[in-house]
Protein backbone atom coordinates (compact mmCIF):
# COMPACT_ATOMS: atom_id res chain seq x y z
CA UNK A 1 0.00 0.00 0.00
CA UNK A 2 1.23 3.49 -0.84
CA UNK A 3 2.33 5.83 1.94
CA UNK A 4 -0.05 8.74 2.43
CA UNK A 5 0.95 12.41 2.30
CA UNK A 6 -1.30 15.24 3.44
CA UNK A 7 -0.48 18.45 1.54
CA UNK A 8 -1.83 21.71 3.00
CA UNK A 9 -1.52 24.82 0.84
CA UNK A 10 -3.95 27.55 -0.18
CA UNK A 11 -2.46 27.70 -3.69
CA UNK A 12 -4.33 25.48 -6.12
CA UNK A 13 -1.23 25.47 -8.35
CA UNK A 14 1.00 24.20 -5.51
CA UNK A 15 -1.54 21.51 -4.57
CA UNK A 16 -1.73 20.41 -8.22
CA UNK A 17 2.08 20.37 -8.49
CA UNK A 18 2.42 18.26 -5.33
CA UNK A 19 -0.26 15.86 -6.55
CA UNK A 20 1.45 15.57 -9.93
CA UNK A 21 5.01 15.21 -8.66
CA UNK A 22 4.28 12.90 -5.72
CA UNK A 23 1.06 11.16 -6.80
CA UNK A 24 2.77 8.43 -8.78
CA UNK A 25 4.55 7.06 -5.70
CA UNK A 26 2.29 8.18 -2.84
CA UNK A 27 -1.36 8.63 -2.02
CA UNK A 28 -1.51 12.44 -1.88
CA UNK A 29 -4.44 14.12 -0.15
CA UNK A 30 -4.59 17.89 -0.67
CA UNK A 31 -6.52 20.48 1.34
CA UNK A 32 -6.59 24.28 0.93
CA UNK A 33 -6.50 25.45 4.55
CA UNK A 34 -5.62 24.65 8.14
CA UNK A 35 -9.10 23.86 9.39
CA UNK A 36 -9.67 21.38 6.56
CA UNK A 37 -6.36 19.75 7.46
CA UNK A 38 -7.26 19.56 11.16
CA UNK A 39 -10.65 18.08 10.26
CA UNK A 40 -8.97 15.51 8.04
CA UNK A 41 -6.48 14.59 10.77
CA UNK A 42 -9.22 14.16 13.37
CA UNK A 43 -11.59 12.14 11.16
CA UNK A 44 -9.39 10.04 8.87
CA UNK A 45 -6.43 7.75 9.18
CA UNK A 46 -3.23 9.62 9.91
CA UNK A 47 -0.94 10.36 6.98
CA UNK A 48 2.66 9.21 6.98
CA UNK A 49 3.91 12.73 6.18
CA UNK A 50 2.52 16.27 6.14
CA UNK A 51 3.64 18.99 3.73
CA UNK A 52 2.33 22.38 4.81
CA UNK A 53 2.54 26.08 4.07
CA UNK A 54 2.81 28.10 7.30
CA UNK A 55 0.73 30.93 5.76
CA UNK A 56 -2.82 29.66 5.51
CA UNK A 57 -5.78 31.98 4.87
CA UNK A 58 -7.86 30.76 7.80
CA UNK A 59 -5.12 30.89 10.45
CA UNK A 60 -2.37 33.13 11.73
CA UNK A 61 1.10 32.44 10.31
CA UNK A 62 2.51 29.17 11.67
CA UNK A 63 -0.69 28.33 13.61
CA UNK A 64 -1.25 25.00 11.84
CA UNK A 65 2.40 23.95 12.18
CA UNK A 66 2.33 24.98 15.85
CA UNK A 67 -0.88 22.98 16.34
CA UNK A 68 0.85 19.87 15.01
CA UNK A 69 3.74 20.31 17.44
CA UNK A 70 1.47 20.83 20.46
CA UNK A 71 -1.18 18.23 19.63
CA UNK A 72 1.04 15.20 20.02
CA UNK A 73 1.11 14.50 16.28
CA UNK A 74 4.54 16.12 16.00
CA UNK A 75 6.45 13.07 17.13
CA UNK A 76 4.38 10.71 15.05
CA UNK A 77 4.10 12.49 11.69
CA UNK A 78 7.07 14.23 10.04
CA UNK A 79 6.28 17.73 8.76
CA UNK A 80 7.87 19.40 5.73
CA UNK A 81 7.29 23.15 5.39
CA UNK A 82 6.84 24.96 2.05
CA UNK A 83 7.29 28.61 2.91
CA UNK A 84 7.15 31.91 1.09
CA UNK A 85 8.37 33.67 4.23
CA UNK A 86 11.84 34.96 5.05
CA UNK A 87 14.50 32.23 5.25
CA UNK A 88 15.67 33.21 8.74
CA UNK A 89 12.13 33.19 10.15
CA UNK A 90 11.37 29.91 8.40
CA UNK A 91 14.50 28.24 9.78
CA UNK A 92 13.86 29.36 13.35
CA UNK A 93 10.16 28.43 13.30
CA UNK A 94 10.89 25.03 11.78
CA UNK A 95 13.33 24.31 14.60
CA UNK A 96 10.88 25.68 17.18
CA UNK A 97 7.95 23.58 15.93
CA UNK A 98 9.88 20.45 14.98
CA UNK A 99 9.52 20.42 11.20
CA UNK A 100 11.97 17.94 9.70
CA UNK A 101 12.65 19.90 6.50
CA UNK A 102 11.70 23.12 4.78
CA UNK A 103 11.72 24.50 1.26
CA UNK A 104 11.40 28.15 0.33
CA UNK A 105 9.00 29.04 -2.47
CA UNK A 106 9.58 28.89 -5.34
CA UNK A 107 11.08 25.44 -4.82
CA UNK A 108 12.60 22.88 -7.15
CA UNK A 109 10.06 20.03 -7.55
CA UNK A 110 12.80 17.44 -8.18
CA UNK A 111 14.64 18.42 -4.98
CA UNK A 112 11.37 18.25 -3.05
CA UNK A 113 10.53 14.84 -4.51
CA UNK A 114 14.00 13.48 -3.68
CA UNK A 115 13.75 14.81 -0.13
CA UNK A 116 10.28 13.31 0.35
CA UNK A 117 11.50 9.94 -0.98
CA UNK A 118 14.41 10.05 1.50
CA UNK A 119 12.10 10.90 4.41
CA UNK A 120 9.47 8.30 3.57
CA UNK A 121 12.10 5.58 3.12
CA UNK A 122 13.08 6.03 6.79
CA UNK A 123 9.51 5.60 8.08
CA UNK A 124 8.65 2.38 9.86
CA UNK A 125 5.58 0.52 8.60
Give the residues covered by each predicted segment.
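Short amphipathic alpha-helix used as the core "switch/output" element in two-component signaling
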Residues: 39, 62-75
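C-terminal output helix
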Residues: 107-116
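Conserved acidic segment of CheY-like receiver
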Residues: 2-12, 18-19, 50
Amino acid sequence: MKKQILAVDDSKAIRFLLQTVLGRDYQVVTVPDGYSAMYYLSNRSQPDLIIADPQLPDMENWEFIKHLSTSGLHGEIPVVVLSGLDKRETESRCVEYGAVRYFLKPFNPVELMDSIHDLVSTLVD
